[in-house]
From Swiss-Prot:
This is Integration host factor subunit beta. This protein is one of the two subunits of integration host factor, a specific DNA-binding protein that functions in genetic recombination as well as in transcriptional and translational control. It comes from Photobacterium profundum (strain SS9). GO terms for molecular function: DNA binding; structural constituent of chromatin. Heterodimer of an alpha and a beta chain.
Amino acid sequence: MTKSELIERLCSQQTHLSAKQVEDAIKEILEHMAGTLAEGDRIEIRGFGSFSLHYRAPRVGRNPKTGDKVELDGKYVPHFKPGKELRDRVNAAIAA
């Protein structure tokens, strides 16, 4: 599902809200989530999951075009861990 598809689905369910209001709300939520992660904080949405940062250590990579070795710096990457309720719901839907 894309962001546009999410907006369309929410608009069809929440007919009292305009598409612009739904789009603005989603953009605001995502912006706050990105800002929270950028500050190094964790986000927990009970029943859904949590977002945190994982550190990837520096390593030696390879340029796929030339095959040359490249030093890659360490970095933080966003990580999502699904909650138990979400895992159970997905597994039940797929198993059915």
